[in-house]
Every structure is written in C-alpha cells, then in structure tokens.
Design a protein with these regions (language model features):
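Structural/interface elements that position substrates and couple domains in central-metabolism enzymes
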Residues: 1-60, 72-89, 93-122
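Cofactor-cradling patches in redox/metallo enzymes
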Residues: 64-70
C-alpha cells in the first residue's frame, strides 16, 4: 500500500462530471486522506466540501483544480498550509505561483493527479 498523504483538493465540486470531484473519489479509493475545499458546500461520497480558507494541519499535498486567475486569492492560504508539494492539474498551470512556491521550498508539480494515482506515482 502507498504511503498515506493528506491531500487538500482545491476547487472541489459536488458535480460528478468535474475532475475535482473525480480526484476526491480517486484519492479515497487509493486510501489517501483527503480534504475537499471548494466554492460551494456539498458532499463527495462522504467527504464534506469546505469553503473559504479552513485551517487544516499536516497537509502533504495541495492539488489545484482552479484556473490561474482565481488562484491569487489562495496564495497566502496555500503557503499557510505548509505543504510539501502543490500539484497543478491540466488547465491550472501558473508559472508565477510555481516560482514563488519553489522559492519557498515547496515542490510545484505540473501533472494530472488522477494519472499519478493510477500509475502509482503519487
């Protein structure tokens, strides 16, 4: 079994066709601890979608599912979580933020989290 890594999915949606929704379900299937943060409250399986900037401890990975134009509102929040890495899923790549993360010693990853999970590279 892979090491458990608490992952915060940023941009989580209760809509089952959204990739953020699929990501939360996939993390749960892979026995990973997940925190879903989105713009609207809701549920993904049994996981509650939190809103705003909830204080969460021991976050290993932040997986981003929001476009770069909306990410600026979350810069300070993501830094406050002190993750080891931030995954920029397709359509979310933000070179400016990736550079800032790297300077802070946080690994920016430009990959699809779903593929990483399925390939055992998570």
């Amino acid at each position: 079994m892979a090491e458990r890594k608490k992952t915060l999915v940023l941009g989580a949606s209760p809509n089952p066709v959204r990739f953020s929704h699929k990501a939360v379900k996939s993390l749960l299937r892979h026995d990973q601890e997940v925190v879903a943060v989105g713009f609207r409250e809701g549920l993904i399986v049994e996981e509650e979608i939190l809103t705003g900037h909830p204080p969460i401890e021991d976050v290993h990975t932040v997986s981003i599912y929001i476009g770069s134009s909306r990410q600026t509102d979350y810069y300070d929040y993501i830094f406050s979580l002190k993750p080891e890495r931030v995954i920029f899923n397709p359509g979310t790549v933000n070179p400016e933020f990736m550079g800032r993360l790297k300077q802070a010693g946080i690994e920016p990853v430009s990959e699809c989290m779903l593929v990483m999970l399925n390939d055992g590279e998570y």
